[in-house]
Amino acid sequence: MKSSFKSEYPFEKRKTESERITEKFQNRIPVICEKAEKSDIPEIDKRKYLVPSDLTVGQFVYVIRKRIMLPPEKAIFIFVNDTLPPTAALMSAVYQEHKDKDGFLYVTYSGENTFGSL
């Protein structure tokens, strides 16, 4: 999935920023979170996050749900490099495995109505 953050900022600028962030906040992870192109759930109000390294994927999903004010009947899925990370995985482990060359972890979220509408 193509990141609009990557297309807006040149590689060197992104790399410099992620290095500055990881030096200043050593136990935090720089994450870029963007909505999947064809998803029908709301756009997120900010896409750059500084996530505690001991946060689980499930806890991060909860943060995203709250930020986009997603109703309980809607499901949300997050993808890292087009794969669904395990809910119990630590964000630090996901970061180590999937971080981009620029130092950011790119997360895409998507949703679907799992319960249907009445």
UniProtKB/Swiss-Prot annotation:
**Xref: SUPFAM superfamilies:** Ubiquitin-like (SSF54236)
Q: Which residues would be cut away as propeptide?
A: 117-118
Recorded hits in CDD domains, A to Z, give: Ubl_ATG8 (cd16128)
Function according to Swiss-Prot or TrEMBL? Ubiquitin-like modifier involved in autophagosome formation. With ATG4, mediates the delivery of the autophagosomes to the vacuole via the microtubule cytoskeleton. Required for selective autophagic degradation of the nucleus (nucleophagy) as well as for mitophagy which contributes to regulate mitochondrial quantity and quality by eliminating the mitochondria to a basal level to fulfill cellular energy requirements and preventing excess ROS production. Participates also in membrane fusion events that take place in the early secretory pathway.
Lineage summary: Eukaryota, Fungi, Dikarya, Ascomycota, Saccharomycotina
Q: Name one GO biological process term.
A: cytoplasm to vacuole targeting by the Cvt pathway
Task: Name the residues annotated as site: Cleavage.
Answer: G116, S117
The entry's comment on post-translational modification says: The C-terminal 2 residues are removed by ATG4 to expose Gly-116 at the C-terminus. The c-terminal Gly is then amidated with phosphatidylethanolamine by an activating system similar to that for ubiquitin.
For molecular function, the Gene Ontology terms on record are: phosphatidylethanolamine binding; protein tag activity
Q: Which organism is it from?
A: Vanderwaltozyma polyspora (strain ATCC 22028 / DSM 70294 / BCRC 21397 / CBS 2163 / NBRC 10782 / NRRL Y-8283 / UCD 57-17)
Q: Which GO terms describe its cellular component?
A: autophagosome membrane; cytoplasmic vesicle; cytosol; fungal-type vacuole membrane; lipid droplet; mitochondrial membrane; phagophore assembly site; vacuole-isolation membrane contact site
Concerning InterPro entries, the annotation shows:
Atg8-like, Ubiquitin-like_domsf
Record bears the keyword Protein transport = yes
Please state what the protein is called: Autophagy-related protein 8
Note the lipidated residues of kind Phosphatidylethanolamine amidated glycine: G116
Topology class, membrane: Lipid-anchor
Q: Please report which protein family the annotation says this sequence is part of.
A: Belongs to the ATG8 family.
Q: Which UniProt keywords apply?
A: Autophagy, Cytoplasmic vesicle, Lipoprotein, Membrane, Protein transport, Transport, Ubl conjugation pathway, Vacuole
By its UniProt entry, which Gene3D superfamilies does this protein fall under? Phosphatidylinositol 3-kinase Catalytic Subunit, Chain A, domain 1 (3.10.20.90)
Give the top-rank taxon of the lineage listed in the UniProt record for this protein: Eukaryota
Give the location in the cell.
Cytoplasmic vesicle, Autophagosome membrane; Vacuole membrane
